[in-house]
Regions:
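Short helix-capping segments at alpha-helix termini
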Residues: 19, 134-136, 158-162, 228, ...
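Conserved AdoMet
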Residues: 31-106
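Hydrophobic pocket-lining residues within nucleotide cofactor-binding pockets
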Residues: 34, 172, 265
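Conserved SAM/SAH cofactor-binding pocket of Class I
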Residues: 98-196, 219
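Mobile active-site "lid"/loop adjacent to the S-adenosyl-L-methionine
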Residues: 187-216
Length: 276
């Protein structure tokens, strides 16, 4: 079967299963199995798939119809222009989380020697993206999941920045021995009531939180009062509906700080910024 014909059939199957990204998913899976860039796939529609290639592709499409994310099927997700290894042990990096990296980079000089703590590092995407852009910065990457830390280390090593990063197994800020200059965190913030099929494959510990999704955000804000250095900063990704409540909570804990909510490219309230 030609790849163009397989692609048409695959898109039909995915659409019939309400997969909104059907065309893109089929293209990504073809690129993955053929080990060719997407541009090659588009310019060579006449290529004939081998039997093994077609069997593999059909198996992947079947898994995709069951809502398994493409990132887990290919063990890859692009974030901040970098490719990261991901599997079911870590949250799949989202485009909106790039705002956390952007925000931190705007606040730090290129040759600065500040210390950053990335709490709930997961795949390490935030840590690695910052390390690639700020060569003098020291980063502490913390996670409560040992498998996640192993993946973060793997990704850091693939970009040659592992020596700049301290990987720490721990819960939130409990393992930070001295205050840090910046705390960054993309913690679980989805309320249990908002569980959806498309995120059912991702680790629940990395997605959901109690107290309407605010439990861990409130904990890290409370703990950070003794973990931030003078003139320190903290940037937390939030669930847009939480913006007002979490902002009030932050102001109560840091009455003299500059506290603001930053919006993402979709104009949704996405980042809580606290500057001492």
């Amino acid at each position: 079967m030609q790849i163009s014909n397989w692609q048409k059939e695959a898109v039909k199957v995915l659409i019939n299963h309400s997969i909104t990204s059907a065309a893109l998913d089929a293209e990504v899976l073809l690129s993955f199995v053929l080990k060719k860039p997407k541009e090659y796939i588009l310019s060579h529609p006449e290529i004939i798939l081998t039997k093994n290639q077609q069997v593999t592709l059909d198996r992947l499409i079947k898994k995709r119809t069951q809502s398994e994310p493409v990132a887990y099927l290919t063990n890859n997700k692009e974030f901040y222009g970098l490719d990261f290894y991901v599997d079911e042990n870590v949250l799949i990096p989202r485009p909106e989380t790039e705002l956390l990296v952007d925000t931190a980079l705007k606040e730090i000089n290129y040759d600065s020697t500040v210390t950053i703590a990335d709490i709930g590092t997961g795949s390490g995407c935030i840590t690695v993206a910052i390390a690639k852009n700020l060569p003098q910065t020291k980063i502490i990457a913390v996670d409560i999941s040992r498998p996640a830390l192993a993946i973060a280390k793997r990704n850091a090593k693939s970009y040659g920045v592992e020596k700049k990063i301290s990987f720490v197994y721990g819960d939130l800020l409990n393992k930070l021995k001295v205050p840090v200059d910046i705390i960054i965190a993309n913690l679980p913030y989805v309320p249990n009531s908002e569980a959806k099929k498309e995120i059912s494959f991702e680790p629940k510990i990395a997605v959901f939180a109690e107290n309407y999704g605010m439990e861990l955000l409130e904990k890290i804000i409370t703990q950070s009062k003794t973990k931030l250095s003078k003139n320190g900063m903290m940037f937390l990704e939030i669930h847009p509906p939480q913006a007002e409540k979490i902002s009030v909570f932050a102001k109560h804990n840091f009455p003299g700080a500059k506290i603001s909510i930053l919006k993402d490219l979709a104009n949704k309230e996405r980042i809580l910024s606290i500057k001492l």
